[in-house]
Design a protein with these regions (language model features):
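Extracellular and organelle-lumenal recognition/adhesion modules and their flexible linkers in secreted
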Residues: 95-547
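Extended alpha-helical stalk/coiled-coil segments
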Residues: 1-109, 113-116, 123
C-alpha cells in the first residue's frame, strides 16, 4: 500500500506540475488573446478611419467630377462663343476690306504722261525732252545724250545746302537739289563784299574777328568777340557793313532790300540788322530789327519799323540761326544800305567776352532772302536758274491734269508780282497756260491758273486756292474735256469755271519755275515730283497733301 501511495503521490505531483504548466500556458494564451483583442480593436479603428477617408475621398471625387463636368460644359460654351466671335470678326474683316478696297480704284493714279521727280537729278521717268547729262565712269566725266533729260541752264555758279545740311557750291549749269527738291531762283546780287572771307569783313575796330574758320557743315564763320575796352558799354557794334552810298538803288521798280545771315550767340545777347539811306550827301537811319538769342524774339524800332519784315529760323542740327530782314523803300529814297551788328542784352551792357558767331552775310535787292552769293572785292551776281522741257509730246490738248510738290522760300513779301510754277514760251494767247502764285493783297500766296479767251487777249484767272501761311504743299490743276478748269492746293479744290483753252499747237517750251533770265517771274523756291496727265483724274486722285 505504501508503494501504491508513493506512486499515487508521484502521480499527483506530476499532475500538479502539469496543472501548473497548463495554468501558465493558459495565462500566456490569455495574454496573447488580450493582445490579439487589442490588435483587433486597433485594426477595427484603423478600418473605420480608412472607411471614413474612403467615403470622404469618394465625396470629393464626386464633387470634382461635377466641377469638371461643369467646366467642360462652360468650355464648350466658350468655344462655341469664340467660334461665333471669330466668324463675326472674319465677316467684319471681309466687309471692311471690301468697303476699303472699293474707293482705291478711284484713288490710285494712272501712270503720268510726264513725270519729273526733281529729287536728285534732271532725269524724267516719262515724257520727252532731248538733252544731255554728265555721267562719271572711273575718273572720266562723259556727256551723254538722252530723250528724257530736263534742260537746265544757269550762267554762274551758285551755292546751296545739300541733303546732309552741308554748304555746297554748284558749277555753272549745275542744278541744285536740296531737301525740298530742285531749287529754282532768279537773278540776285550780294552787296556785301568779301562775303565768304570772315577775316576781311568790315567790322568796327572794337570787334576781334581773328577766331575764324570753316565749321563741320562747310560754313565760313568768324567768332566776333567784343574787345575788353567795350566792357560796360551799351552801344551796338558793326560786324559787317554795306554803306548806303554803295548800296541798293531803290529809285526804280525794285523797292525791296533784304539783309540776311547765319548767327549763333549765348542766350540774351542780340543781333541787330540795321537799314540806312543815302540821298547823295546825307546818311539817315531808317530802322532796326533786333533778334534776341535763346527766345528768337524779334523787335523792330525806328521810323521805318512798320516797313520792315523779319524772321529767324534755327537749324536744330547745325545750330545756325538764319536771320533775315526786308525793308520796303518809299518814294524819295534812292540808295539803301545795311549793317549786321552785335548788341548787348536788352537794357544791359557789354560784358567781358561777349561774342556772336557770324556766317553767310548777304544784302540783296529783293523781297526775300535767296541762296548765299560769294563775293570778293565787289558785289557779285548769281544768274537765274532756267528749267525747260518742250511742249512737243508732253502737252497737246484737253483734258490736262497737273500735280506738283511746291516749297516757296518767301513769306509775307513776294519775290515778284507772279512767281511761276510753269508757263509756255512764245505762244498765241489762246494756247497759253500760266500756273503761278497770286501776290495781290486779297489773295496773297494763293495759286491760280490763267488762260485766255479766243476772241481777245483778255486772260481769265481761276478762283484762287491755298492758304497764305502755308509755304509747302502739293498744288495742281484740272482742265476738263467739257471746257472747265479749277485749281487744287493740298487736296482742296476751287469750283470749276469756263475756259476756252483747247490745247497748244505751237512747238515751244514749258518754262518751269521761272520766265526769263532777268528773274522777274521766278519761283524762289523748290519743285519736286512734277506730273502731267492727258486725262481727267478723280477728286480722290487729286487729294494729295503734305505738311
Amino acid at each position: 500500500n505504501a508503494k501504491s501511495s508513493q506512486t499515487a503521490a508521484k502521480t499527483s505531483e506530476t499532475n500538479a506540475k502539469a496543472s501548473e504548466t497548463a495554468a501558465k500556458n493558459s495565462q500566456v494564451a490569455a495574454a496573447q488573446s488580450e493582445s490579439a483583442a487589442a490588435g483587433s480593436a486597433s485594426a477595427a479603428a484603423a478600418s473605420a478611419t480608412a472607411s471614413a477617408n474612403s467615403q470622404k475621398a469618394a465625396k470629393t471625387s464626386e464633387t470634382n467630377a461635377k466641377t469638371s463636368e461643369t467646366a467642360a460644359a462652360n468650355s464648350a460654351k466658350a468655344s462655341a462663343a469664340s467660334q461665333t466671335a471669330a466668324k463675326a470678326s472674319e465677316d467684319a474683316a471681309r466687309e471692311y476690306a471690301s468697303q476699303a478696297a472699293e474707293p482705291y480704284k478711284y484713288v490710285l493714279q494712272p501712270l503720268p504722261d510726264v513725270w519729273i521727280p526733281f529729287n536728285d537729278s534732271l532725269d524724267m521717268i516719262t515724257g520727252f525732252s532731248p538733252s544731255y547729262k554728265k555721267i562719271v565712269i572711273g575718273d572720266d566725266e562723259i556727256t551723254m545724250p538722252g530723250d528724257k533729260v530736263v534742260k537746265f541752264k544757269r550762267a554762274s555758279t551758285a551755292t546751296y545746302i545739300n541733303k546732309s545740311g552741308v554748304f555746297s557750291v554748284a558749277k555753272i549749269d549745275e542744278p541744285r537739289f536740296e531737301k525740298e527738291g530742285l531749287l529754282i531762283e532768279g537773278q540776285r546780287t550780294n552787296y556785301f563784299v568779301k562775303s565768304n572771307t570772315p577775316a576781311e569783313w568790315t567790322s568796327t575796330s572794337n570787334i576781334d574777328k581773328t577766331n575764324n574758320g570753316v565749321d563741320e557743315f562747310g560754313f565760313s564763320y568768324a567768332k566776333m568777340r567784343t574787345k575788353d575796352n567795350m566792357t560796360g558799354q551799351s552801344s551796338a557794334l558793326s560786324l559787317h557793313t554795306c554803306s548806303a552810298s554803295r548800296g541798293i538803288d531803290v529809285s526804280g521798280d525794285n523797292k525791296y532790300c533784304t539783309v540776311s545771315c547765319r548767327v549763333k550767340a549765348p542766350d540774351g545777347l542780340r543781333c541787330r540788322l540795321r537799314f540806312e539811306k543815302y540821298d547823295g550827301s546825307v546818311y539817315t537811319f531808317l530802322g532796326d530789327a533786333y533778334l534776341t538769342f535763346g527766345t528768337l524774339i524779334i523787335e523792330k524800332t525806328g521810323g521805318a519799323a512798320n516797313r520792315i519784315a523779319a524772321t529767324a529760323t534755327k537749324d536744330p542740327v547745325t545750330g545756325w540761326i538764319f536771320y533775315e530782314a526786308t525793308i520796303e523803300a518809299v518814294e524819295g529814297e534812292a540808295l539803301i544800305g545795311a549793317m549786321i551788328q552785335y548788341a548787348p542784352k536788352k537794357g544791359g551792357i557789354t560784358e567781358a567776352g561777349d561774342y556772336i558767331y557770324l556766317a553767310t552775310p548777304q544784302f540783296e535787292n529783293g523781297g526775300c532772302a535767296s541762296s548765299f552769293v560769294i563775293t570778293t572785292t565787289a558785289p557779285a551776281t548769281r544768274s537765274s536758274d532756267m528749267v525747260t522741257i518742250p511742249t512737243e509730246n508732253n502737252i497737246y490738248n484737253r483734258p490736262l491734269t497737273c500735280l506738283v510738290e511746291v516749297n516757296r522760300n518767301w513769306g509775307d513779301i513776294p519775290p515778284n508780282v507772279a512767281p511761276r510754277i510753269f508757263d509756255f514760251s512764245g505762244v498765241p494767247p489762246i494756247e497759253s497756260i500760266t500756273y503761278a502764285f497770286n501776290t495781290t493783297e486779297k489773295c496773297y500766296g494763293q495759286l491760280y491758273i490763267q488762260t485766255y479767251k479766243a476772241s481777245t487777249s483778255t486772260y481769265v484767272s481761276s478762283v484762287f486756292a491755298g492758304r497764305t501761311d502755308v509755304r509747302k504743299f502739293i498744288g495742281g490743276f484740272n482742265i476738263y474735256s467739257d471746257g472747265t478748269k479749277r485749281v487744287v492746293s493740298n487736296g482742296e479744290a476751287t469750283k470749276t469755271m469756263k475756259t476756252e483753252w483747247t490745247g497748244v499747237k505751237t512747238r515751244t517750251f514749258i518754262r518751269i519755275g521761272g520766265q526769263a533770265t532777268s528773274g522777274t517771274r521766278h519761283l524762289f523756291g523748290h519743285l519736286r515730283n512734277l506730273r502731267l496727265w492727258h486725262k481727267e483724274l478723280t477728286d480722290a486722285q487729286m487729294g494729295e497733301s503734305i505738311k
